[in-house]
Amino acid sequence: MALLQEKKHEIINAYQVHETDTGSADVQVAMLTERISKLSEHLKTNKKDHSSRRGLLKMIGQRKRLLTYIMKKDQAHYRELIKRLGIRG
């Protein structure tokens, strides 16, 4: 499930570290979180779509790796980010 260009710009503007930042770990995690939520909704109605389920698991793994990187770099920033995104209970 691809994101619309307007939604991408909205996410980038919300999570960017500086003016030209489009690929920092924060932005990537926010984009993946949005894609994961969209794909989860898709899979609720299309239970037999196994290829999308595999893609979802790959995205979750990628997000987990990025969050681990952020956590190792700065614990306080990590806690703020997951709170802002509303993930991890």
Curated annotation (Swiss-Prot):
**A GO term for molecular function:** rRNA binding
- What UniProt keywords apply to this chain's record, in alphabetical order? Ribonucleoprotein, Ribosomal protein, RNA-binding, rRNA-binding
The record's Gene Ontology biological-process terms are: translation
- Note the PROSITE patterns from the entry: RIBOSOMAL_S15
For this chain, the family text in UniProt reads: Belongs to the universal ribosomal protein uS15 family.
Any idea what job this protein has? Answer: One of the primary rRNA binding proteins, it binds directly to 16S rRNA where it helps nucleate assembly of the platform of the 30S subunit by binding and bridging several RNA helices of the 16S rRNA.
What is known about its subunit structure?
A: Part of the 30S ribosomal subunit. Forms a bridge to the 50S subunit in the 70S ribosome, contacting the 23S rRNA.
**UniProt protein name:** Small ribosomal subunit protein uS15
The protein's organism comes out as Acaryochloris marina (strain MBIC 11017)
